[in-house]
Amino acid sequence: MGKAFSQLTSQKDEDKSILPDNPAMASKAANYFSTGNRKPSHSCVPCEKAASTSFVTCPTCQGNGEIPQELEKQLVALIPYGDQRLKPRRTKLSVFLAVTICLLIFSLTIFFLYPRNIVVHPVGLNSSTVAFDETHVQLNMTNVLNITNSNFYPVTVTQLTAEVLHQTSVVGQVTSSLRLHIGPLASKQMPYEVASRILDENTYKICTWPKIRVHHILVNIQGALTCSYLTHPQQLPFESFEYVDCRENMSMPHLELPRPA
């Protein structure tokens, strides 16, 4: 007898609604609960609107039903496991495309920004002027450098330093600031002038003695160019040996050399 009474009381407690005693909301929420083995034919049944209650669209009914706004934070929406919203579309394809694009951009950036050689090649002596006094030879030479930029970005030549050596003695020096721009994959020729003063007695005789037919002397030109690219400075050394006629002025114009392949 007591057992039957206990079961009856338990059944009454289960049938008791957990919602507030509002007739409009109770009738509204009744459509979203099932007891025992009862199975609704639809995931959400359209509900009748009450005049004094505001409603929000049921998230699982695809817009076909409504729930009381007061119960929006109390009711739980159930969606099938096979619902398309639980299966992100083309996730693998999107990730693959994103990774591929990032790798492609990274590879292209490395390819175009990777520093390549900047070649400085002395073309030779372009012209020279000679002057004498009683003890020394004043020799002014104009030389030409060919600069080749193998990078995919421009470079700027900012400084030139050079010195002239004759018989291991420094006879002339020059330092000058420049602003020579060289485009990507381009070559330019740059002339520069060095004034030299030779005090060697034997050299003076070679240059001034009229009985000597050949008045050439050998000078060694050493120098360096300072280039800047992508805010990075770089020094490029060069060296050349030139035979100079120290008896009279001469001019040997050099045409621009083609860029080496």
UniProtKB/Swiss-Prot annotation:
Disordered: region residues: 1-22
- Provide one Gene Ontology biological process annotation: positive regulation of tumor necrosis factor production
Its annotated compartments are: Cell membrane
Q: Which Pfam families match?
A: TMEM106, TMEM106_N
**Superkingdom, according to UniProt?**
Eukaryota
Q: Which UniProt keywords apply?
A: Cell membrane, Immunity, Innate immunity, Membrane, Transmembrane, Transmembrane helix
Q: Identify its membrane topology class.
A: Single-pass membrane protein
Q: Name one GO cellular component term.
A: plasma membrane
Which residue spans traverse the membrane?
A: 93-113
Bias class Polar residues marks the residues at 1-10
PANTHER family for this protein:
TRANSMEMBRANE PROTEIN 106A (PTHR28556:SF3), TRANSMEMBRANE PROTEIN 106B (PTHR28556)
Tell me which family the UniProt entry assigns to this protein.
Belongs to the TMEM106 family.
Q: What does this protein do?
A: Activates macrophages and polarizes them into M1-like macrophages through the activation of the MAPK and NF-kappaB signaling pathway. Upon activation, up-regulates the expression of CD80, CD86, CD69 and MHC II on macrophages, and induces the release of pro-inflammatory cytokines such as TNF, IL1B, IL6, CCL2 and nitric oxide. May play a role in inhibition of proliferation and migration.
Q: What is this protein called?
A: Transmembrane protein 106A
Q: What is the lineage of its organism?
A: Eukaryota, Metazoa, Chordata, Craniata, Vertebrata
